[in-house]
């Protein structure tokens, strides 16, 4: 079974949690795209749900698949958000943002009663940090922001190289990647993040940092698909505790 099939299996398992009348957060990325496609099939069969997309790419996918959409300005909460992750640790802390939608993804996850993370089992790691940590920044004053980030790294016991993300493919290939919100992303190769909550707090306090890819205490459960089947891991403490 290839990686794409595993991702679709995880998406199908998460779809079992969806009930008629739910308001859903729709994640971004290759695994979340499988969920949107499968959800569209259920909608075509009569399921009544409404979704909030976390990116323009997901909005286009959901529209193509016939999933009704709304915004967080029009509804007061979401029942479930289903999204992928770049890394998941045993505490269900995440690194997200490989697709560049981390800001909207975090807003939507925080507005949800539950966040279900779907992934193939290669995303399960003992410690976060092998995957580069995305940090969304305002382009103005980037040098000062980078220096403040490096100071935060040192205070939190990590170090590594940062690079401004470049777009890949299409007519923007090689140019600076720009998020849906008009920001840039610094990808930090840290190797091992010894204390994700402390680093998350330090990064959030830096002027010029819009958001970062550490999702701490947001995931309620993770659905991991591998060669031996599906594993569902619940967070030890309920969201909000």
From Swiss-Prot:
Q: Which InterPro entries match?
A: NagB/RpiA_transferase-like, Ribose-5P_isomerase, Ribose5P_isomerase_typA_subgr, Ribose5P_isomerase_type_A
Read off the Pfam families from this record: Rib_5-P_isom_A (PF06026)
Q: What class of enzyme is it?
A: isomerase
Gene3D superfamilies documented for this protein: 3.30.70.260, 3.40.50.1360
Q: Does the keyword Isomerase apply?
A: yes
Q: Name its pathway.
A: Carbohydrate degradation; pentose phosphate pathway; D-ribose 5-phosphate from D-ribulose 5-phosphate (non-oxidative stage): step 1/1
User: Which keywords belong to this entry?
Assistant: Isomerase
Positions of substrate binding: 28-31, 83-86, 96-99, 123
The GO annotation for biological process reads:
pentose-phosphate shunt, non-oxidative branch
Q: Where is the secretion signal located? A: none
User: What Enzyme Commission number(s) does the record list for this chain?
Assistant: 5.3.1.6
Entry's Gene Ontology molecular function annotations: ribose-5-phosphate isomerase activity
Known catalysed reaction(s)?
A: aldehydo-D-ribose 5-phosphate = D-ribulose 5-phosphate
- Could you confirm whether the keyword Nucleotide-binding appears in this record? no
Residues at the active site? 105 (proton acceptor)
Relate the assembly described in the record. Homodimer.
Q: What does this protein do?
A: Catalyzes the reversible conversion of ribose-5-phosphate to ribulose 5-phosphate.
Known NCBIfam families for this protein? PRK00702.1, rpiA
Which HAMAP family does the annotation name?
Rib_5P_isom_A
What the record says about family reads: Belongs to the ribose 5-phosphate isomerase family.
PANTHER family membership: RIBOSE-5-PHOSPHATE ISOMERASE 3, CHLOROPLASTIC-RELATED
Protein name listed in UniProt:
Ribose-5-phosphate isomerase A
């Amino acid at each position: 079974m290839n990686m794409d099939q595993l991702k679709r299996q995880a998406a199908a398992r998460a779809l079992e949690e969806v009930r008629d009348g739910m308001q859903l957060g729709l994640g971004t990325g290759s695994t979340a795209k499988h969920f949107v496609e499968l959800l569209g099939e259920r909608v075509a069969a009569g399921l009544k749900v409404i979704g909030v997309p976390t990116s323009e790419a997901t909005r286009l996918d959901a529209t193509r698949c016939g999933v009704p959409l709304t915004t967080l300005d029009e509804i007061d909460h979401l029942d479930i958000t289903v999204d992928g992750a770049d890394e998941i640790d045993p505490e269900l802390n995440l690194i997200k943002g490989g697709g560049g939608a981390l800001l909207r993804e975090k807003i939507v996850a925080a507005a949800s009663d539950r966040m279900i993370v779907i992934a193939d089992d290669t995303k399960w790691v003992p410690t976060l940090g092998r995957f580069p940590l995305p940090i969304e920044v305002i382009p103005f004053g980037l040098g000062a922001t980078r220096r403040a980030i490096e100071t935060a790294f040192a205070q939190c016991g990590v170090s590594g190289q940062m690079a401004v993300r470049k777009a890949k493919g299409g007519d923007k290939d090689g140019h600076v990647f720009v998020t849906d919100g008009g920001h840039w992303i610094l990808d930090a190769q840290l190797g091992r993040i010894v204390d994700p909550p402390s680093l998350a707090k330090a990064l959030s306090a830096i002027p010029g940092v819009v958001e970062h890819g550490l999702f701490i205490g947001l995931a309620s459960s993770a659905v991991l698909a591998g060669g031996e089947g599906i594993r569902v891991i619940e967070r030890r403490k309920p969201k909000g505790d």
